[in-house]
Amino acid sequence: MPKMKTKSAAAKRFKRTAKGGFKSGNSFTSHRFHGKTKKQRRQLRGLSMMDKSNVKRYKKMIPAK
């Protein structure tokens, strides 16, 4: 049986955690910050956890690890 290939687009965007979850960067962070509050901008920094409802789909995209 052939190996499962990793979706390269998913590998670039998502990181797998030790417990099997996924982290990703936030959207709405590239421009137009004048329309966002300081709190919004602060909370959009860094990575955020993906919702549990999508984890099964992401595990198929990134089978290794």
From Swiss-Prot:
Keywords on record: Ribonucleoprotein, Ribosomal protein
Keyword Nucleotide-binding recorded: no
GO molecular function: structural constituent of ribosome
Presence of the UniProt keyword Zinc in the record: no
Region (Disordered): 1-65
Biased segments, Basic residues type: 1-18, 31-44, 55-65
One GO term describing the cellular component: cytosolic large ribosomal subunit
UniProt xrefs under PROSITE patterns: RIBOSOMAL_L35
Lineage top rank: taxon: Bacteria
One Pfam family in the UniProt entry: Ribosomal_L35p
An example Gene Ontology biological process: translation
UniProt record similarity statement: Belongs to the bacterial ribosomal protein bL35 family.
Name of protein: Large ribosomal subunit protein bL35
Species of the source: Limosilactobacillus fermentum (strain NBRC 3956 / LMG 18251) (Lactobacillus fermentum)
